[in-house]
Amino acid sequence: MIADRYADLAFEHCTHQVLADITSRHGVDFATTLFYDRIRRSPQNRELVAALESAGAETERPQARGRILIAPALFYRERPDIGGDGAAIQRAALAAGLDVEILPVASAGTARTNAEQLRTLLYERCTDPTVLVSLSKGAADVRLAFESMPPPPGLRAWVIVSGLLHGTPAIDRLTRRWWSRWGLRLLLARHGAPFELASEFSAYKSSSLRKPALAPPGILVVNLFGCPLAAHVGTRFGRIRHRQLSALGPNDGLTLLRDAFVQPGLIYPLWGADHYFRTDAVPGLLSRLITFLVAKDCLRAAARVR
C-alpha cells in the first residue's frame, strides 16, 4: 500500500524538492496519493479531517449566526459558470442562516490592486463573528492585504479554497514563448485585465507572491484544496497544465499543491477534485465545515434542524 511506502516521511518533510524527487521515481499520481495521505495523517489536521468526514453530521443541517465574506476568484463576474463567485459557499451559508456577501473587488484586478480594496472593505464589512472565505486568486488578494494590516476586529477565521497564494510555473510556461504569451495577453485583455496580472503570478520572476504565505495572527486558518490524480482533472486545459506541471510534483491543474496552503493552518485535501473544487462531495463538506467553525467559536451556534 502507498501508505506504507516512505513510512518515515511526515507531512512537514514533504518539501517541494522531496515531492519532485518522489514524482520522478514513481510518477505524479503516486506522489499525489502519498502527499494526500501525509496531510491527513498529520496530527495538526486530524481534528479537521474527522469533522469534515463525520458520518453523523450527514443527517443534520447546521444552523449558525454570523457573517461569511467571500473574496472571489479571478473573472468571477465574467465567468460565474466556473464557480469563482462562491455560489456553492453562498448556498451552504444561506441554508445555515448566515449572512453572506461577495466582497466587490475588481473582477479582473491585479492582486496588488484588489489587496488595496480589501484593506478598506474588510474593516467596513467585518462584524463579530465573521469568517472570510477566499477562492483561488482571491487568496492572493487577501494574503497581500493581510501583509500590511492586522486582521480586523470580528474576523474569526480565514478559509482558503484552492488557494492561488504563490506564483505558479504554469504562468511562466505561458509567458516563455511569444505565441503563448500573445494568447495570454489576448485572454486577459478580453476581460479587461492588465498583463501585470500574469507577472504577479510568475514562480520565478520577482513578485510580491514569491515569499512564503503566512497566517495572520489571532485567527483560525483552514485550507481546502483538491487533490487530483491525472484522470480526475476535469477540463482539457486543466489536463494539459497538470501534465506540464507534473514533473514538479502534485498539482491541481493550475498550481502545485505544496503552494496551495498557508501555515500555520489546518489543511483538508479533497480527493478527486481539481483546482475548480467541484465534486459531488462539496455541498456536504461545506455544511460540515460550518459546523466545525461553530465548534471553534468562529461562528455562533443556533438551534439545529433535522
Residue positions per predicted region:
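Flexible, membrane-associating and regulatory peripheral segments of lipid-active enzymes
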Residues: 1-82, 91-96, 306
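Active-site catalytic motif of lipid deacylating hydrolases and related acyltransferases
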Residues: 59-130, 186
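Hydrophobic/aromatic beta-strand patches that form the interior of the parallel beta-sheet core
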Residues: 69, 101, 157-159, 220-224, ...
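Short, solvent-exposed loop/turn segments at secondary-structure junctions
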Residues: 74-76, 108, 137-139, 164-166, ...
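Short aromatic-enriched loop/helix-cap "lid" or pocket-rim segments at secondary-structure transitions
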Residues: 81-82, 169-174, 231-237
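Glycine-rich, phosphate-binding/catalytic loops in enzymes
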Residues: 85-88, 148-151, 175-178, 240, ...
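Serine-dependent carboxylesterase/thioesterase catalytic core
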Residues: 116-215
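C-terminal catalytic-base region of ester-bond hydrolases, centering on the histidine
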Residues: 217-306
